[in-house]
Amino acid sequence: MKNLVYFLVCILIISCKNEVKKTDALGVVEFQVTGNNEAQASFEKGLLLLHSFEYDDAREAFLEAQKKDPNMAMAYWGEAMTYNHTIWGEQDYDAGFLAVEKISHFQDSDLYSPVEQGLIGAVIVLYTPKTAKLERDVAYKNYMKSLYKTYPENQEIAAFYAISLLGSVPEGRDDAIYGQGAEIAKKVLEKNPNHPGALHYLIHSYDDPYHAALAIDAANSYSKVAPDASHALHMPSHIYVALGMWDEVINSNIDSYQASLNRMKRKELDNNARGYHAYHWLEYGYLQIGEFEKAKQMVLDMESYAKETPSDRTNMYLAFLKGTYLVESNQWDSSIADMDIDVSNLHLTAQAQYYFIEGYEAFVEKNAEKIETLIEILSAEIDKESLLVENISDGFTVCSSLSRSAPTQSNIDQSLIMLNQLKALNGWLENDVLNTENLLKETILQEQNLSYSYGPPVIQKPTSELYADWLITQKRYSEAIYQYTATLERATNRRLALEGIEKATKLSVQGKMEI
């Protein structure tokens, strides 16, 4: 009998252990909301996923919570929050507004805590009708600030206030505001080091070469805290790229991309569920350590994914991977250079990247006529975008949904830099020394005014690096070294800049020996 009892206890222990293994590893939140226990579990899963920007899966969990308890107000709040992608500049306004309509009657009910009512009020502000997106973002931030002052110990209010600060910056980075977000996230982590949102938002707050070291602990922790969120596995590489830690960049994005494949298989999804963002960063990591063949195969695989499941998204990432590979490998005679990609439906910056790559290939082939044609095409696209941005600033759009293809001043500024790079390449090809140098110097100044571009650079060939390459052809080696070194200020341990310094130094020594 004792043996039977012992056997049953062992089975029970093993069963419990197996159950623990099946639990999603998404981090830890301490937030009890009004609703039954079954719905609470679904809500908590949705909240954890929301903090890791796994918006589709978070929405699925929140909708599940609504079914389990139709009176759980916070489940509707969560659904509405999944339609607003703060850092990504995306919002499905119509879907979010419909979710808010389901939630509004809960706001003043005595059934819900003041914290719940406060968060419901905040999301209603986020989807205020007939109000421009930036105004809503700022109003939401201010609302969250007031909640934070009232409930400074509430970790969820603190976390969402931190991310609202980042979301209130219309374009690029604002170090002062991002610093505020970081300080709030750090306070949450002091109490709960496994909070996925605080870890995530701290990384975003310090995501540039000048601050990245301040988030290295968060980067090292986040993927361990929330390994079942693909984005949590990718996010540490933001800090690793900023610090030039290429092995870590590679490992992070191998894990993140594999997690997306696991999810794709589990949910029986098509290629659009692949983590192309992590895939692109992985390619960039390989190229920084000279793994050209691995990177090339990735571009070829991306081409096959785009053919199997054609979409604007796959075309965009194919263009990204093509451009990154060619710039970083300098293998312009590769078959990759001959890939034709339809970029007509992509946002302006993606089009400009593609036209720059086509122009650089024409430069290598000494085809000035093609460069001039590309300059005309890109100039026309910039003019169109400028008109759209002007209309938006004049109030022609208010509550329409936003996506990354929406016209922005940042897109124009980035594209003007690539346009000037094309003009400089044309001048270089025509041996117009004065015009080429003036264009490159002017463009460097323009690029310095841009916010830091995390990850694979948006300006795929940094202008200071391009200028340094040109200076070498003019035998101005010390100036070239200076420009390559300047490139490293925003691109830590960038391989081409480091190799450029080495090359210019050797040529300089040889030149002195010949004298």
Give the predicted meaning of each segment.
Residues 55-57, 79-113, 121-135, 168-176, ...:
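Inter-helical turn/loop elements of alpha-helical hairpins
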Residues 38, 45, 79, 121, ...:
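Structural register within alpha-helical repeat arrays
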Residues 72-73, 154-156, 195-196, 229, ...:
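Residue-level recognition of tetratricopeptide repeat
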Residues 42, 76, 83, 118, ...:
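TPR repeat positional signature
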Residues 67-68, 108, 148-150, 189-191, ...:
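Solenoid-like repeat scaffolds
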Residues 14-15:
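C-terminal motif of bacterial Sec signal peptides marking the signal peptidase cleavage site
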